[in-house]
Amino acid sequence: MRHVWKTLLLVTFFFNKGIANDCVPYRIDDDVIACVCNATYCDGLPDGRPEVPEEGNSYWYVTNKQGLRMKMSEVKFDSCENFPVDVTLTIDNTKKYQTIFGFGGAFTDSTGINIAKLSPATQLQLIRAYYDPKEGSRYTLGRIPIGASDFSERQYTYDDTPNDTTLKHFILANEDFDYKLLYARKALEFNSEIRFFSAAWTAPLWMKSNDNGLTFLKEEYYQVYADYLLKFLDEYKNNGIDIWAITTGNEPLTASIFKLPNISMGWEPETMANWIANNLGPTLASSPYNETLIFAFDDNRQVLPRFVEPTFRNQDAKKYVAGTAVHWYQDSKTPADVLDQTHDEFPDKLIFMTEASVIGPPIWNTSKVKLESWHRGERYILSIIEYMNHWSIGWVDWNLALDETGGPNNINNNIDAPIIVNPKTDEFYKQPMYYATKHFSRFVDRGSVRISITDNDTIKSAAFVTPSAENVVVLYNRATSPRHVVLKDVQKGTLCLELSPQSMNTLKYK
């Protein structure tokens, strides 16, 4: 039977300076844990210690299936006497790769709907858990849908008046003011370094063909739709949110396969390239938003690099596009080598992972949340490691928060989320997925550069050097037993670590 441990003594004890606020566990059984947060308490990292340890030491943060959550200790370099070795990994920070831009999640309508059901104090705790650079995950990215997504209670765009080619009736929705803008601005209060990017699920219905339920933008509305997106940038700026980047639209392949005419829109690779070259690109370039980046594609990687080749081989389109946005769905069926191929073919273009979530059981099963699932947290951290090691500049989760059914969703496509909201008790639950992203986002600052580290089938790894010349190493032990790991830094020395079973580990040293 589910029960919550909320001992007040824990709350008092762990507010001591320099000691992390420990997880108050919500348990189903002994090895399945989420962490409970409410208006007065939420686990977080300590705020009374130096950012990096003294020379010769490393901070070591551990989250594991047994219940540790970001548990911090110090380990000394070159203290390996009589240490048994299972795995040796070598770091070389002279071998550098891509620069990291950040990590984040999406301010969907559903996220806002769920946050709004909490008390004001608990709302701030939730936003702090993600965006506070001191105690939270230090997220620096936020994705904002342009109009409705499936994670809205209704299907809408900003101009549903047929044939309004001058966009006279363009207007933001109540959902923008009540949910998206409101909480995006609150996040900015915690961290002014947040950059927001946006994608539309669809153009207004009257701009599209809808033959047999499959939906594409009509060519006569190519410029009107570019103007529509420009108006969105205007309205959000007028309401305090600058948009750093937009994509060419959410999941154009999905709209070419599934009949969801009201909340999807397909593109063919060649027509997308032409629209960028002749409409979207010039429209943004001649506007006050000429520094707003454009990312093409925004879909699953199984058709890369083929889908973006027409865009990047069309010089009139290529000059406007910063890179390729990609989602994680179907990754198990498509090796990450396609990201390397895309990078190798177009090395001057960025790769950016913009959506991940755990969908769970089939679509007709409405119960998609598996509270406290370690396996789902494992999927997250392995995905982040993989994308970092294959040229992505960031990794962005989908909904920041959902309810205990994984909704609301207007097509019954409920899913899981790193934070689950319980308005009845004015609480939210931080799942293992939350800590998986935090093991990266809290330590890998914007401007960090990925560096070389050897890999292993059991111990998955990624390594970075930050703009402050700190080294950050993330390790995941996939084994169900401890592993003794020797971490050799060519410049710094050797760390000897006993990694607990199924554990997430972040090391930080100067």
Place the predicted regions along the sequence by residue.
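Short, conserved phosphate-binding/catalytic loop or strand-edge motifs used
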Residues: 249-255
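Cleavable N-terminal signal peptides of Sec/SRP-targeted secreted and luminal proteins
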Residues: 2-21
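Short linear sequence signals and composition-biased patches located at protein termini or domain-edge surfaces
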Residues: 3, 182-183, 501-505
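Compositionally biased, intrinsically disordered low-complexity segments enriched
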Residues: 5-8, 246, 504
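Active-site loop signature of alpha/beta-hydrolase-fold enzymes
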Residues: 149, 251, 359
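N-terminal catalytic cores of secreted or lumenal carbohydrate-active enzymes
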Residues: 65-244, 248, 263-270, 274, ...
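Substrate-binding and catalytic surfaces of secreted/luminal carbohydrate-active proteins
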Residues: 21-91, 196-198, 227-234, 239-244, ...
